[in-house]
Amino acid sequence: MTDRIARVERTTKESSITVELNLDGTGIVDVSTGVPFFDHMLTALGSHASFDLTVHAKGDIEIEAHHTVEDTSIVLGQALGQALGDKKGIRRFGDAFIPMDETLAHASVDVSGRPYCVHTGEPEHLLHSVIGGYPGVPYATVINRHVFESIALNARIALHVRVLYGRDQHHITEAEFKAVARALREAVEPDPRVTGVPSTKGSL
């Protein structure tokens, strides 16, 4: 299996993003987006997926975090898709249940080449909650869905994320990110019994 690494850069009038990703890493993570809670979530994602992940982002956070979070998620998805390459020899499917105190979240991944995202189960108060920002730039949890959609669509994977139950917005969001991390880790792992692309069609 060839090196599964990627480096993607994206610059717009709203942000400048660089992501470096190694799917066969050991969880070495260096993240700086200017949004402390998002840094915390991306660090959890890389660590629990055992990816080596570097994210450097500069955006118009003086307006709010939305553009930076959105654009970083797009570039992360692009890097994931690029690092996957021809997808030969991978498990393809992965899923994980992650508890965090009162919260339980679940994620399922299919490295299918058919981009899709389902995000469900978050309590309604997460539409209006913010985390952090005292000091620092706050993270509005309403963007959780958009983060996962952006990763899935740009990586060309099917990603389902659901919250089975929970109350605390921090616990819910963190459990979701960790569930996605563990599901991705399983899905992209090499399977010694798979010699080609894991599809009856012969391609993904």
Swiss-Prot record:
This is Imidazoleglycerol-phosphate dehydratase. It is found in: Cytoplasm. Its EC number is 4.2.1.19. It catalyses: D-erythro-1-(imidazol-4-yl)glycerol 3-phosphate = 3-(imidazol-4-yl)-2-oxopropyl phosphate + H2O. One of its GO terms (molecular function) is imidazoleglycerol-phosphate dehydratase activity. The lineage of its organism: Bacteria, Bacillati, Actinomycetota, Actinomycetes, Mycobacteriales. Keywords: Amino-acid biosynthesis, Cytoplasm, Histidine biosynthesis, Lyase. Belongs to the imidazoleglycerol-phosphate dehydratase family. NCBIfam families: PRK00951.1-6, PRK00951.2-1, PRK00951.2-4. Pathway: Amino-acid biosynthesis; L-histidine biosynthesis; L-histidine from 5-phospho-alpha-D-ribose 1-diphosphate: step 6/9. GO terms for biological process: L-histidine biosynthetic process. It is an enzyme of class 4 (lyase). GO terms for cellular component: cytoplasm. Its main location: cytoplasm. It comes from Rhodococcus jostii (strain RHA1). The keyword RNA-binding does not apply.
